[in-house]
Structures are given as structure tokens and as C-alpha cells.
């Protein structure tokens, strides 16, 4: 059986130092990018708080979330439910590695949310011993010397504000599908399905480790 990993993404309120997660998506994948299980959770304690959601990055999506919740495409749950679902999923597949693109931010977001809304005896979201990998770190290694990727970003003006090559998930995925007009959904699970493709491409390019710490 191929080794399994979890790819995770969050959408949060706007406070960078203490971001609070209102959308948490994750998928179980292998190194080839195959998906074995996925979950899309809208976090009730944050999403139903109008004051907190007023500072959400993508507040314009609130009505879309409600429609998708009613259709069963996403589940409105307490944060503890999302956490225990992830923990149970890790146990089910024997997963020790969780990754995200720009993982420091998502790691901070789930821990900040955990400390604000959940049982205070659990200070950290992930089980003890979980390895956190960063597909951004992996992508910089995999694409950093790729002249074709640098040219793609330059030709389509997909560079950073200071003119350097961008390694956002959106821009890397644009390159992978050769479509500079592609736009990320900026919803948890949908962005996960982009990030798992980036992970798989990094592995194909020989980058097989992305430990953040």
C-alpha cells in the first residue's frame, strides 16, 4: 500500500497574528496525488459569529457557503468535530505527515482556533508527533531553477511585487495546467485539490521531503 499523507487548507479571519479558521478542508493522498478520502468543514464557532466573519478574507463567499452546506457539499460542524475527524482519519490510514502550502500560516490558524474555541486542555490541533510539511518549501526547491516556470511567470506577469518569481499555489497550478487565467477558489477543500497536485509534481521532480521544522 502506498504511503498516505494529509493535505490541508484553511480559510480564516483577517488577523495575521491570530487567524481564526472558518473553513477547513483536507484530503488523504498518496505521492502520485490520488485522493482516498476528503472532508470539507465550515467551522460553526467562527462562521456563525457575524463580528468575526466581518474580518474574513473572503466574506463575499458567505452566501455560497450556505448554499453548499444546504446541498451537503460542506458540513457545518464544531471545531472539535473537525479536529477529531482529522485525528480519526490519520489513525485509519496510519498517517504521520500533514502538509499545506505555506504551512506556517495554516498551522498557526488551526492552533489559534483550537485555543480560542475548543477544550483548553488541548493546546495544539494536531496529535503529538505529527510532522508538518510545507509544499511551498518543496515547490521552491522543485521549481526554483526551472527556467520554463520563471519564463511563464514573467510572460504572464505572475511575479511578486519586487519582480521575483512567485511560488503561490495558484501560480504554480497555472503553470502545471498551462492556463494563466486560472483562479483559486479560496475555499479549503478546493484549494487542497490544487495543492495535492503541486505535491505530486514536486515528488515527480525528486523533492520527496518537505518538513517544516
Per-segment meaning from a language model:
Residues 2-113:
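Conserved non-catalytic scaffold segment of RNase H-like nuclease domains
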Residues 15-17, 140, 197:
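Conserved protein kinase catalytic core
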Residues 69-73, 120-126, 179-185:
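Short, polar/flexible loop-turn hinges at active-site or ligand-entry regions and domain interfaces
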Residues 97-104, 108-109, 153-213:
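Acidic, Mg2+-coordinating catalytic module of metal-dependent nucleases/exonucleases
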Residues 104-133:
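Substrate-recognition/cap helix-loop segment adjacent to the acidic, metal-dependent catalytic center
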Residues 132-160:
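Short alpha-helix plus adjacent loop in nuclease-associated cores
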Amino acid at each position: 500500500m502506498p504511503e498516505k499523507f494529509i493535505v490541508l487548507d484553511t480559510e480564516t479571519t483577517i488577523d495575521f497574528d491570530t487567524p481564526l479558521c472558518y473553513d477547513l478542508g483536507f484530503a488523504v493522498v498518496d505521492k502520485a496525488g490520488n485522493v482516498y478520502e476528503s472532508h470539507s468543514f465550515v467551522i460553526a464557532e467562527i462562521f456563525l459569529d457575524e463580528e468575526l466573519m466581518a474580518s474574513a478574507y473572503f466574506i463575499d463567499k458567505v452566501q455560497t457557503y450556505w448554499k453548499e452546506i444546504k446541498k451537503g457539499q460542506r458540513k457545518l460542524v464544531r471545531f472539535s468535530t473537525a479536529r477529531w475527524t482529522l485525528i480519526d482519519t490519520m489513525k485509519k490510514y496510519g498517517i504521520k505527515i500533514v502538509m499545506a502550502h505555506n504551512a506556517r500560516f495554516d498551522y498557526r490558524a488551526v492552533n489559534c482556533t483550537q485555543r480560542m474555541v475548543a477544550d483548553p486542555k488541548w493546546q495544539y490541533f494536531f496529535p503529538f508527533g505529527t510532522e508538518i510539511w510545507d509544499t511551498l518549501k518543496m515547490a521552491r526547491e522543485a521549481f526554483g531553477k526551472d527556467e520554463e516556470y520563471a519564463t511563464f511567470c514573467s510572460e504572464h506577469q505572475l511575479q511578486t511585487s519586487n519582480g521575483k518569481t512567485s511560488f503561490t499555489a495558484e501560480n504554480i497550478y497555472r503553470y502545471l495546467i498551462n492556463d494563466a487565467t486560472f483562479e483559486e477558489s479560496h475555499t479549503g477543500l478546493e484549494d487542497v485539490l490544487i495543492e495535492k497536485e503541486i505535491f505530486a509534481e514536486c515528488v515527480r521532480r525528486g523533492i520527496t521531503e518537505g518538513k517544516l521544522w
